Amino acid sequence: PYGATLEVKDNSGYAYVGLRLNGNVQAGIYDSRFVGNQAQAYAAAGGFSTGSYADLNYCLVAGNQANLNGGTANAGGFSVWSGSWGNFYQCTFAANSAEYGSALTVGRGSSATVDGSIIWNNPGDNALAAVQWDNNGSNLDVYNSVVQGGESGMYADELSNIYYDGLLDMDPFFCDPANGDFSIDVLSSAITPWGEPMGALGYGCEGTVMAAAHILSVEDVPNDQGGRVYVTFEKSLFDTDGLSRTEMYTI
């Protein structure tokens, strides 16, 4: 199907729990939610295998758990496997867990692209992984996205490759992740080069960003009986041009 909108939540099984495409099939999935799915092995949110093609836009992939049987399984989020292809445009991967490739794993001669997305707080050895199987390497391209840990949050083995450009390693400032709100603060710096908020959900709040100002200089006035020390700050994100009480600093 193309143009499908899905809500896939709280399923459990062995593998490919939330969604599976297998064989010569294609799917376009938009504005969808894959949340809270659990796999004993791999691909808790879902996977694409054996030459399938998937195009995901503005999708939330959150709180999915793989490798519950305690092995070395990957892909708490999605798996792209065995000659398949996946495109993830402005998606949010958060709080997915697996032994490795906890958000997304590409393997056995497959390819995937991630663009304008947020990959944050996905427990495991790495959030993004490109791996070989039966000596078939894989490729993953990551553009204009927040990836926790930057390059160290991604892994490619000796037969696989990860290419990246426009990678950001910075807190996206989710609005209320503890309660499932993965939209971002209006002052978040997770912004694409074309000016849109990264991830699936856009802006949803303000006031979660507390930016610390840098101290530019400290000048102690000699012989003033310890009365005064002058501290000069750079301008804060919260500063205004006029007098107000909105200036906020961390010292």
Model-inferred region functions:
Residues L140, I184-D185, A213, T246:
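A broad, structural micro-motif
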Residues Y164-E206:
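C-terminal accessory segments
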Residues G63, E196-M198, Q225:
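Short secondary-structure junctions and interdomain/linker hinges
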Residues T208-R245:
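Pro/Thr/Ser/Gly-rich low-complexity, intrinsically disordered linker/stalk tracts
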Residues P1-D10, V209-I215:
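Short intrinsically disordered, low-complexity coil segments enriched in acidic
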Residues A129, D157-E158, A200-G207:
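Short, flexible loop/turn segments with low-complexity composition
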Residues M248-T250:
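Beta-strand signatures of extracellular beta-sandwich domains
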Residues T5-K9, A15, R20-D181:
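Predominantly extracellular beta-rich ligand-binding scaffolds that present long acidic/polar faces
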